[in-house]
């Protein structure tokens, strides 16, 4: 069930679902696995906010266990494509593709709340069918693994070899460790400068 917010004005009351109300403040919330539905919604929201005001930052709050690599890359590419900076904030858990998107925020504008957890690892996948089909899927997973590792190395400043080693298995970090690693830029315990009216 999505909470409803009632807003009063001189013209009466108006009801909004909470996510629509947050969107008015340029806040997007990823609080679920990354799927085609969640990715399409987030991409559409970013494009809408860019069209509304290309100079004002967009805030992406992330509490996600990860999900589809392809859909996550669609969000990532849109974050890099839109003119406004996208500030990212981890609330709770940013794991797998969630951590990748957290790291994809504008440099200097990536943060985590103090009790959150961040986890990186290699992409997961599986294949069935004929040997040639399994080989095609295995090659694609290896391609994606290399692509994600190279982006993480670029965005964190870590050597590619370290990223490859650390993503071989689940690699959990505290917010302070994620700052040292280069995944985020700061740990916050108070609301960033913007505020919801």
Curated annotation (Swiss-Prot):
Gene Ontology MF terms in the entry: ATP-dependent peptidase activity; ATPase binding; serine-type endopeptidase activity
GO annotations of cellular component type: cytoplasm; endopeptidase Clp complex
Location in the cell: Cytoplasm
UniProt entry keywords in alphabetical sequence: Cytoplasm, Hydrolase, Protease, Serine protease
EC identifiers of the protein: 3.4.21.92
Record field: catalytic activity: Hydrolysis of proteins to small peptides in the presence of ATP and magnesium. alpha-casein is the usual test substrate. In the absence of ATP, only oligopeptides shorter than five residues are hydrolyzed (such as succinyl-Leu-Tyr-|-NHMec, and Leu-Tyr-Leu-|-Tyr-Trp, in which cleavage of the -Tyr-|-Leu- and -Tyr-|-Trp bonds also occurs)
Family annotation (InterPro entries): ClpP, ClpP/crotonase-like_dom_sf, ClpP/TepA, ClpP_Ser_AS
SUPFAM superfamilies: ClpP/crotonase
Main localization, broad class: cytoplasm
CDD domains for the chain: S14_ClpP_2 (cd07017)
Pfam families attached to this UniProt entry: CLP_protease
Active site positions, chain numbering: 96 (nucleophile), 121
Keyword flag Protease: yes
GO BP term, example: protein quality control for misfolded or incompletely synthesized proteins
Keyword Transit peptide: no
NCBIfam families named in the record: clpP, PRK00277.1, PRK12551.1, PRK12553.1
Family to which this protein belongs: Belongs to the peptidase S14 family.
Subunit structure: Fourteen ClpP subunits assemble into 2 heptameric rings which stack back to back to give a disk-like structure with a central cavity, resembling the structure of eukaryotic proteasomes.
Record function comment: Cleaves peptides in various proteins in a process that requires ATP hydrolysis. Has a chymotrypsin-like activity. Plays a major role in the degradation of misfolded proteins.
Protein name stated in the entry: ATP-dependent Clp protease proteolytic subunit 3
Gene source species: Prochlorococcus marinus (strain MIT 9313)
Gene: clpP3
């Amino acid at each position: 069930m999505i909470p409803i917010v009632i807003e009063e004005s001189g013209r009466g009351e108006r009801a909004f679902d909470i996510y629509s109300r947050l969107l008015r403040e340029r806040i997007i919330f990823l609080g679920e696995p990354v799927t085609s539905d969640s990715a399409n919604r987030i991409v559409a929201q970013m494009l809408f906010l860019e069209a509304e005001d290309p100079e004002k930052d967009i805030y992406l709050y992330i509490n996600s266990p990860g999900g589809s690599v392809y859909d996550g890359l669609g969000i990532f590419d849109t974050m890099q494509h839109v003119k406004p900076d996208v500030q990212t904030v981890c609330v709770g858990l940013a794991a797998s593709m969630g951590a990748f998107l957290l790291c994809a925020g504008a440099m200097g504008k990536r943060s985590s709340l103090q009790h959150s957890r961040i986890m990186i690892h290699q992409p997961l996948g599986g294949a069935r069918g004929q040997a040639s089909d399994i080989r095609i899927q295995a090659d694609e997973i290896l391609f994606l693994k290399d692509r994600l590792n190279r982006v993480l190395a670029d965005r964190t400043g870590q050597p590619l070899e370290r990223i490859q080693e650390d993503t071989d298995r689940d690699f959990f970090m505290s917010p302070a460790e994620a700052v040292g690693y280069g995944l985020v830029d700061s740990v916050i315990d108070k609301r960033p400068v913007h505020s919801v009216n």
